[in-house]
UniProtKB/Swiss-Prot annotation:
Positions of ATP binding: 39-46
One MF annotation (Gene Ontology) recorded for this entry: ATP hydrolysis activity
Listed CDD domains: ABC_NrtD_SsuB_transporters
Protein source organism: Bacillus cereus (strain ATCC 14579 / DSM 31 / CCUG 7414 / JCM 2152 / NBRC 15305 / NCIMB 9373 / NCTC 2599 / NRRL B-3711)
Higher taxonomy: Bacteria, Bacillati, Bacillota, Bacilli, Bacillales
SUPFAM superfamilies, A to Z: P-loop containing nucleoside triphosphate hydrolases
GO cellular component terms, semicolon-separated: plasma membrane
Protein name stated in the entry: Aliphatic sulfonates import ATP-binding protein SsuB
């Protein structure tokens, strides 16, 4: 399974004229890759994810998953937003199943499997208002992975959470990745998060958004954020922002 992003450019039409958001984005992912995308605000990271997800088909270039051009959403792509976007009138297990029927034994068994993987045992019948924000994001992760997508796209899914919950969900996500080897593209503003999670870090520059640098991350798992090797890689990434002219409002 491969994901190929070839020559992707994106323009928005505004009252003041045409604005280019992405310029000639090219990269490939092999099965089981975990890639993080990081860059200044406004560099088009989220726009790129929406294109790969098939949520935006008004672009130049091509996105191909398993040899098939992507122009619409499909079961090949799972998407997790910063907000969990759960249906408040559905229980945890019903949200995970989404439009699939829990009366189907296969669906019921799959939902039960994912409830266990994301550690929500005992909360299957709970409603979103009865669980925490971190638990709600675990439901969103399970929902996105229930259909076994070829690639999971994550748009700053832990950005609004407190540090302790974010750290816990990073571990949950890594455990899932190690078990399932789902290919992942994860957008973040957090350099430590990018280094901790992925095996490749794509650094983007802004206006228009383009790939500034790709850094291979060969640190062994599990990773220690206080280790010398982690800090050395962190310095290497930071230098791209400091000396590459990428720092604007935030990283």
């Amino acid at each position: 399974m491969t994901v190929s992003i070839d020559g992707v450019s994106k323009y928005f039409l505004k009252q003041t004229g045409t604005v280019q958001v992405l310029e000639n984005i090219n990269f490939q992912l092999e099965e089981g890759d975990f890639v993080t995308v990081i860059g200044p605000s406004g560099c088009g990271k989220s726009t790129l994810l929406k294109i790969v997800a098939g949520l935006d088909n008004d672009f130049e270039g091509e996105v191909v998953i398993d040899g098939e051009p992507i122009l619409k959403t499909s079961k090949k792509q799972g998407f997790i937003f910063q907000e969990h976007r759960l249906f408040p009138w559905l229980t945890v297990e019903e949200n995970i199943a989404a439009d699939l029927s829990l009366k189907d034994k296969y669906v019921k068994d799959k939902v039960r499997e994912w409830v266990e993987i994301v550690r929500l045992d005992g909360f299957e019948k709970s409603y979103p208002k009865e669980i925490s924000g971190g638990m709600s994001q675990r439901v969103a992760i399970a929902r996105a992975l229930l259909r076994d997508p070829n690639v999971l796209l994550l748009d700053e899914p832990f950005g609004a959470l407190d540090a302790f919950t974010r750290s816990h969900l990073q571990e949950v996500l890594l455990n899932i990745w190690e078990q399932k080897k789902t290919t992942m593209i994860f957008v973040t503003h957090d350099i430590d998060e990018a280094i901790y999670l992925s095996n490749r870090i794509i650094i983007m520059s802004a206006k228009p958004g383009k790939i500034h640098k790709v850094i291979e991350n060969n640190l062994p798992y599990p990773r220690n954020k206080t280790s010398q090797s982690f800090q050395q890689l962190r310095t290497k990434v930071l230098q791209q922002f400091e000396y590459g002219g990428l720092i604007q409002t935030s990283i």
